[in-house]
Amino acid sequence: MKIPLRFLLISLVPTLSMSNLLGAATTEELSASNSFDGTTSTTSFSSKTSSATDGTNYVFKDSVVIENVPKTGETQSTSCFKNDAAAGDLNFLGGGFSFTFSNIDATTASGAAIGSEAANKTVTLSGFSALSFLKSPASTVTNGLGAINVKGNLSLLDNDKVLIQDNFSTGDGGAINCAGSLKIANNKSLSFIGNSSSTRGGAIHTKNLTLSSGGETLFQGNTAPTAAGKGGAIAIADSGTLSISGDSGDIIFEGNTIGATGTVSHSAIDLGTSAKITALRAAQGHTIYFYDPITVTGSTSVADALNINSPDTGDNKEYTGTIVFSGEKLTEAEAKDEKNRTSKLLQNVAFKNGTVVLKGDVVLSANGFSQDANSKLIMDLGTSLVANTESIELTNLEINIDSLRNGKKIKLSAATAQKDIRIDRPVVLAISDESFYQNGFLNEDHSYDGILELDAGKDIVISADSRSIDAVQSPYGYQGKWTINWSTDDKKATVSWAKQSFNPTAEQEAPLVPNLLWGSFIDVRSFQNFIELGTEGAPYEKRFWVAGISNVLHRSGRENQRKFRHVSGGAVVGASTRMPGGDTLSLGFAQLFARDKDYFMNTNFAKTYAGSLRLQHDASLYSVVSILLGEGGLREILLPYVSKTLPCSFYGQLSYGHTDHRMKTESLPPPPPTLSTDHTSWGGYVWAGELGTRVAVENTSGRGFFQEYTPFVKVQAVYARQDSFVELGAISRDFSDSHLYNLAIPLGIKLEKRFAEQYYHVVAMYSPDVCRSNPKCTTTLLSNQGSWKTKGSNLARQAGIVQASGFRSLGAAAELFGNFGFEWRGSSRSYNVDAGSKIKF
């Protein structure tokens, strides 16, 4: 078999080190031939016993599985691997292979799988890809004594996966009983599940335990199910020590229990008389979870303080991870029993670094508590911190804001005579994530009376800074102000919330909705310009035209305004006729299809039907001025200077369009993290009116490219409105109706060039918007009733417009024409292209 390089390294390192230490240690190689299965084997299982005083090394050359021992009808009273009392160290060197014990029913053996009688010697299992102890023995063996039992020390080191499950002992340590020191370190995956002891330590019993995670570490469902049982997962012997370090993975204690039927309670760890925790720490990004409490045997206090998240002396490593004590996994019935929620230590506790979290109504009890500035203590309402003999001194107390509405209180107690409670910095309202400020209850003001209760034997000292409150705010969601008020005797504190406003997230805002009115604005102006274009050309009595029309509007993004784009296209049909009085009447209809997008979450599809009516009156400039001057001296002075042949036109136009919108919203709502697409429909309309006049000046000099110059001035008004609507989907919002009003006075000049069968003109104009109401609407998030003004873009109020048109005659009855227009504003660009044909008669 080809062995991976990493496994060779794993096996080489301990082998070399052991060789240096043991010198003449006995070495035996194990391979697949050493496997045994009692259900298929024709021979009885033979245990291996080590007696070499210099120690024994078992070197694995292949994976080994020992299962179903003994054979049916036989008994097994000796450990599968035994180390005699006079023997040296016992080492199992995995070399990257697996080692499995399963269903080992050794009736009286101290350690069904591995037993060592050698005091002050060490049993080591290292370098395995998988190391498993399963039902060794199972609980069906009424006098079993665990999977591993050593009278010296034990080390489980540098294994990829360790699974220790469903083992049983009538004595201490359902899976492991170690009289000396037990070291478990750098295992990439470690699980103690469903192990059981009739006395102490459902999974582990030892004098001294060093537990350092190399990956996820789980203690789940272990139990000491007797009235005298202690330590559902781990029991530390009297005067022993416990060090727990979440160095490279989370450590979880969950569902571990003690007690006989009817008196079952949760217990993660039990500390024997005068036993102590020497280290409880987690590295950055890792957490130690105590869903079951820590208990103590006896009442003797320990002098050494527990410095949480503190490195060993001389070690510069920083521990900034999180330690969680939680009752969240308890059933409602279990939570009623305070024993299931109370962790007790007979030491002073100092919060040195990182974060300690109390959740789910737990009580953390110790001799006294102190806190360094680099650490945080986060407490849910309903949790308690109890100092039994000393004071409580806190510098960074944080209240979990998510628990504010549970109707409970945080309690700090240092009730021993002459002991104080001191809070030196402002209380902080902590949030787990910014989505808290999306909660609908923040839509109203609230007061949470007496949520912090203090009970001291002597003084309660609240520094001047601590009489204020620091709240972790979010730039999104409900905005408001948090305040804290202390009672006269400082024994209670009340926290209040005053709402101010609501700020939507980028996903909630949807500025595309009001910006759709700018699309209607562009489309109706382009339509009106096309009707004017349809009347251009040779002066026939009647004409009918059909054409395609397209428009593009691009609005650039700004710091507080999202960019968007509007694209539309469709068909226009129209007709014009010269009336008996010489006026020209034009009529047109259009159907447009549009697509709008905000380059983020929203895309709109629209369909517009529009109609327009245009009336043009042609006269000489002389007759117009004559009417305007009326009778009097001014007429006689000015009128002689006015040309009697210069043509002048007056025109008016009125247009109406109805639009049906269908918007698509794509969102990523948690949970689950799957893309959601929702469609919403609503309607709107647009009115547009225009009045204008122009004077055509013929170039009679013969010089210059253009033959006619036509200055003009217009007054354009556009009013667009869209209905209110409710969007249903992952992000459900209620949008009020919105409107856009714009009044512009374009002025410019048209330059014309005619040929025998062709006709061109170029238009340049300046168009200031003299009066405008920008689009906006009120948006309400239905999930929390948060409401805000969604503002559309504010296009620059001055525009430069250039248009170029061409006409070509196809005989006496037909004409082709095309038009290109470009509008420039400081914040946007728009284009339109039209092309079609006319039939003249």
Curated annotation (Swiss-Prot):
Alphabetized Gene3D superfamilies for the sequence: Autotransporter beta-domain
All residue ranges annotated as the Autotransporter domain in the record: 537-841
Keywords for the protein's UniProt record, in alphabetical order: Cell outer membrane, Cell wall, Membrane, Secreted, Signal, Transmembrane, Transmembrane beta strand
Topology within the bilayer: Peripheral membrane protein
Subcellular location, record wording: Secreted, Cell wall; Cell outer membrane
Signal sequence interval, chain numbering: 1-24
PROSITE patterns: AUTOTRANSPORTER
Any one GO cellular component localisation term in the record: extracellular region
Family the UniProt entry places it in: Belongs to the PMP outer membrane protein family.
Source organism (scientific name): Chlamydia pneumoniae (Chlamydophila pneumoniae)
Gene: pmp2
Family annotation (InterPro entries): Autotransporte_beta, Autotransporte_beta_dom_sf, Polymorphic_membr_middle, POMP_repeat
Name used for this protein in its record: Probable outer membrane protein pmp2
